[in-house]
Amino acid sequence: MLLLLSLVACGAEAQVRTRGIDVSKFQGTINWTKVAKDSTIRFVYIKATEGTSIQDPRYKANVAGARKAGLLVGSYHLYSSKTTAYQQFGNFKKMVKKKEQDLVPVLDIEGHHSGRLYMARVDKLLELMEAEYGVRPMIYTSERVYKTHFAGKKYAKYHFFIANYRRTPSVRYTLWQYTETGHVSGIRGYVDINRFHRKHSLSDIRMPRPKKKKSATEGEK
């Protein structure tokens, strides 16, 4: 019994200590080797695109550097209410290669969109991303936007990445962006830092492993 309790406690501690960051061009040139030396930093979400045509100039270097350092990598698209889902998906697809992704893609919907989100457009973009990458995207947003647009059963199967810098989110979430003024070795200035809800872990947002193709002789006796 004592051993079981010890294992449970160790698992809970490991989950609490698993953190991730999200970065863009605003973090400048990152020393990913130094970032990876922090044993609690296991993953990173990297900005790829925004709207129809904006592509983060540090994206490719950040993906390559983070992966080389041994961090799990995911990519995010900053949603714009001014252009179509197809245009935004085309921009994201050009930049984000499935084979370079360890984590599910993220659709970033900022708080200022709350009153004019155009939900049909959001739904279509989520649909296109899922078809391309083979997994439901995670949705990043604020509690206010979640309560206004995503609280219903329609989005119950999606993982949510919620920003709240004052307190633990009061809505359903998988990832919590708990600070925008974090400090991590290897990054000059502030960086967003994220951690999991106690019921979730990295396994919940990992990309599915590709299915192995059966050989011509497999199954033969």
Where are these regions (language model features)?
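Catalytic domains of cell-wall/extracellular-matrix polysaccharide-remodeling enzymes
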Residues: 103-167
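Bacterial N-terminal signal peptides
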Residues: 1-8
